[in-house]
Swiss-Prot record:
Organism of derivation: Mycoplasma genitalium (strain ATCC 33530 / DSM 19775 / NCTC 10195 / G37) (Mycoplasmoides genitalium)
Disulfide bonds: none
Compartments where found: Cell membrane
NCBIfam families: MPN385 (NF045751), MPN454_MG319 (NF045771)
Keyword list, A-Z: Cell membrane, Membrane, Transmembrane, Transmembrane helix
Signal peptide: none
Keyword Kinase: no
UniProt name for this protein: Uncharacterized protein MG267
GO CC terms in record: plasma membrane
Transmembrane regions listed in the UniProt entry: 10-30, 47-67, 77-97
Membrane topology designation: Multi-pass membrane protein
Amino acid sequence: MTLLFKLVKIAILVFLMVIGFFIFIGSFWLNTYQTAQWADLLASSDASGIILTIFPNINSWFNATVANQPVLFKTMVHFFIPVGFGLLFGLIIAIIVDILYRLTKYAIKRSYQSN
């Protein structure tokens, strides 16, 4: 039973990471949820979402990172930087939800012990 519980918990955390990833790429980086356009937008354009409000210089940093590199490297980095940030954002969301779950579970357990 504990193995099944752990697998379900891992599946839920992966699901939360995917949701966080979609939120980051859709809202923060590209400002669109039309996933069919994501590959073209990631390869050709800079960030255009909410992230520009939070970090106004991110496009200049992003372009300076790949300025003197070969075309293949530029193409890979145009995908990996936003995807990496998206996965990190998803991981943070999953960790926060896990912490809130554990705190709620602890609070419920404490309330039953005090009665």
